[in-house]
Amino acid sequence: NCPEDYFTLIMRRMMMRISERLARNSGSLALITGESLGQVASQTLPALVTTDSVTNMPVLRPLIGMDKEEIIKISRDIDAFETSILPYEDCCTVFTPKHPKTRPTLSACEEAEKSLAVDELIEKAVNGTEFSVIE
């Protein structure tokens, strides 16, 4: 129920809302993501600003200025690379628009979200959360 070119951004805004709720419930003080500036349409500066506008928590992005090769090297160093390349479907692969917005506006995102039951969807997601401890 929203413009296709905003699918990814709206999903990311929903993920940030859900993440903030879960973080606050667990006593966390910030959100941490693995984004690298400009690697994909949803990681341009305008897209990140639009995504971050739904949270009041700090969003830490330790990889923000690194290129893909640097990130791959780090993932190998911490034994995360093999897991990171496992095939699976996620919202970014299933719902990727043909022409995603690279310079979104906050007002357009907010307008597109008006047709969604945002609070209800967040509540449902938070209540359905399962936690796993990875050692």
Mark where each language-model region is.
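A short alpha-helix-loop-beta-strand transition element characteristic
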Residues: 79-87
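The feature marks non-catalytic terminal segments
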Residues: 86-135
